[in-house]
Amino acid sequence: MKAPKFREFISEAPDNGKYKLLVITDEPEQAKTFHTADRLREEAEKLGWKYYLYKLTGGYTTSPEGALRLHNKDDDKGFEVSGADTIAIIRGSVTRKDSWMDIVSLLEKHSVCVVNSRETISVCADKYRTALRLADYGVKQPVTHLINDPENSEQAFEHLN
């Protein structure tokens, strides 16, 4: 399989200049700072973008009149997202629970630009799948043998060339 060139499948849309940045995380309540999230907020503010830090614990979603809104605990107004103007950044903590990954699927269903997609997160979380995917695109990979039983690890090692 050969990777297509970017210009073959992507083009830049007109820039309306105003986007919304949604950062999805689940940090402990006692965490006083969210270093990466704070930096993202600073950059969004510099660009004049609206920003929302959505915490999965205690958070919920609504869809009034078809529009998707994310709400943190005690936030009745929430934050409306759409595929037209929202960029969602998925923090690593979200990947700790499969049920939390459903928010990524929901955003993708609403055509929101998600960094990283559920598929990307899934592939990257699995070292072997990552190696297979990279090999599909011609990226050289070390010889790999799957070891399903630790007792046979020496035998598998002996077969590496």
Which role does the model predict for each range below?
Residues 2-115, 120:
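ATP-binding N-terminal substructure of ATP-dependent carboxylate-amine bond-forming enzymes
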Residues 21-26, 82-83, 110-111, 118-161:
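Active-site nucleotide/adenylate-binding loops and adjacent lid/helix of ATP-dependent enzymes
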